[in-house]
Design a protein with these regions (language model features):
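Extracytoplasmic/periplasmic proteins that interact with beta-lactams or build/remodel peptidoglycan
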Residues: 49-345, 365-389, 397
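Alpha-helix N-cap/N′ positions at the starts of helices
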Residues: 5-13, 147, 164, 390, ...
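Short helix-capping and inter-helix turn/linker motifs at the boundaries of alpha-helical repeat units
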Residues: 4-8, 326, 385, 455
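Short, low-complexity N-terminal intrinsically disordered segments enriched in polar/charged residues
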Residues: 1-19, 23
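Bacterial peptidoglycan biogenesis and beta-lactam-recognition machinery
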Residues: 24, 35-39, 142-145, 160, ...
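Short solvent-exposed beta->alpha transition segments
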Residues: 12-16, 26-74
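Juxtamembrane and targeting peptides
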Residues: 1-5, 136, 424
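Beta-lactam-recognizing serine transpeptidase/beta-lactamase-like catalytic domain environment
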Residues: 302-313, 351-402, 407-508
């Protein structure tokens, strides 16, 4: 016993021992043992056994309640509970102590971890992955769902001319040899292990059977064949997130990526593991908590014959929810095709219900590329593209131009500042209020008569609406625009930039 533990009661020592567990203070735990009575277990073996189990099941928030102490037998009966990756585990147990001239020491064996655990048993954790929910359009067509890709991997023991083979694989997969070597040098890798290197598009046989197969499909087929010619390379099917509309809905749907160390830290306790994916943008990010679901998990004891001996904890899998949008796939694609070469955003709404039927930002990127894994060169090219394909234009403010004229008309009519039947007179195609405007003139494209509100809207007359704005006045215009919701956050699932009618504090 250590000096600090000398003559502490067995009850106190047991509580202290248990509270070392979530702190991973295994050396301190070992120092409290009567080593000879504990089977002369070495400190190294003790730490290896305890850390593997407690950290494997992710123990935290431990609680201990002393039930009784048998002074004659020197046994402490206690109740303990702690949180794990599969929920709370709680059990009653007994701990034996021996006493010498230095104080009480704990007699340890595997049953102190779990009552029915022996040295020949193993504690296993089994995880059932939750299926991510689908993102659907208004008609149930998939915008984001399950797809299949090809996982290219290496069996290290089957590689011939390792350096040359890795160079070939790197070139075909458009990654560096160093990236491959890093994956092959992972601690878990053995000669007969399948080590996933990169996910690439799967070649569907039906696509190759068409009269004139797509050139990209043929190139992908050729790449598959060249990879499989290299000894040690294997290609297997793997389930991935797939975005059928690609560029047409990339900014709307967004994409998922594998979790990072930062994600695991930020979302600790929310069910993410090193193998999880997480929504990074668009609907995938916005509805992450609904889409991701909750993995199922079991902790159980397995005996020396590999059979389950006892279930310790279990959380049932909860698959992610499907999210249905008001978007119409056909309209979304149609708008994208019309404007894909332009820097633009397009919004289609049902004027009676307010439902958004399409949200398009162009130019765009293919969100499927993020699933396959972008190289640093591809990522740099995307971000440095002068057309900014990653920039989501439908979330930003745009100068409305002539679409603001109906708003000016509405403000004028509501305030009584303008009479819709008043003829402002034909002043030609250029006009200014007076000499105080200097060289500035308001221009328009069409001369017409009578110059009344209805015709001004038909001909989009800049001069008419300049005069109307002057009649309305600064104070009334600002007040009315504020009442219409300008300078406020739009009540919409996707966070939008706040609308504004001036680049300064008001209308000048």
């Amino acid at each position: 016993a250590t000096k600090e533990n000398a003559w502490k009661t067995p009850e106190e020592l047991l509580v202290e021992y248990m509270y070392h567990i979530p702190k991973k203070e295994y050396k301190e735990m070992y120092a409290m043992l009567h080593v000879e009575a504990s089977g002369s277990i070495s400190q190294e073996d003790f730490i290896k056994r305890n850390s593997a189990i407690y950290e494997g099941i992710e123990v935290q928030n431990i609680a201990v309640q002393i039930i009784a102490y048998d002074e004659e037998q020197m046994t402490v009966t206690y109740q303990t509970s702690f949180d794990t990756v599969a929920g709370t585990i709680s059990f009653e147990n007994k701990a034996l102590f021996l006493k010498d001239e230095e104080g009480y020491q704990l007699v340890w064996d595997d049953s102190l971890i779990f009552p029915n655990l022996t040295s020949a048993d193993k504690v296993r954790v089994s995880t059932t992955q939750a299926e991510r929910g689908e993102i659907l359009d208004r008609n149930g067509r998939v915008l984001a769902g399950k797809g299949t890709a090809s996982s290219v991997g290496i069996v290290p023991g089957k590689l011939e001319n390792r350096e040359e083979a890795i160079a070939q694989i790197a070139e075909l997969l458009e990654i560096t040899p160093e990236a491959i070597e890093k994956k092959l040098s992972a601690k878990w890798v053995k000669d007969d292990s399948f080590v996933p290197i990169k996910t690439i598009p799967r070649v569907e046989e039906i696509e190759l059977m068409s009269i004139s197969p797509d050139e990209e499909v043929l190139k992908e087929k050729e790449r598959h064949e060249k990879l499989l010619e290299i000894p040690g390379v294997m290609i297997s099917d793997v389930e991935v997130r797939e975005y059928p509309l690609g560029e047409a809905a990339a900014h709307l749907v967004g994409y998922v990526q594998s979790v990072t160390a930062e994600d695991l830290e930020e979302y600790a306790g929310e069910g993410y593991t090193a193998n999880s994916v997480i929504g990074k943008s668009g609907m995938e990010g916005l509805f992450e908590s609904e889409l991701k679901g909750q993995n199922g998990c079991r902790i159980y004891i397995e005996n020396s014959e590999g059979k389950e001996k006892e279930e310790l904890a279990c959380i049932l899998v909860q698959h992610g929810q499907d999210i249905q949008l008001t978007i119409d796939t056909d309209l979304q694609v149609s708008l994208y095709e019309q404007f894909k070469e332009d820097k633009s955003c397009s919004v289609a709404m049902n004027p009676y219900t307010g439902e958004v039927l399409a949200l398009v930002s162009t130019p765009a990127y293919d969100n499927n590329d993020f699933i396959m894994g972008l190289s640093s060169e591809q990522w740099t090219a995307l971000n440095e593209d002068e057309n900014k394909p990653m920039y989501n234009r439908f979330r930003q403010v745009w100068c409305p131009g002539s679409t603001f004229k109906p708003i000016t008309a509405a403000v004028g009519l509501e305030s009584g500042a303008i009479d819709p039947m008043e003829d402002y007179g034909n002043v030609g195609l250029s006009w200014q209020k007076d000499a105080s405007w200097g060289s500035y003139h308001v221009t328009t494209l069409h001369a017409y008569e009578p110059v009344i509100l209805e015709n001004a809207l038909i001909y989009s007359d800049n001069i008419y609406f300049a005069k109307a704005a002057l009649k309305i006045g600064t104070e009334e215009m600002e007040s009315s625009l504020t009442g219409l919701g300008f300078n406020e956050e739009l009540p919409f699932e996707i966070k939008m930039a706040e609308s504004q009618y001036s680049n300064t504090d008001g209308i000048e």
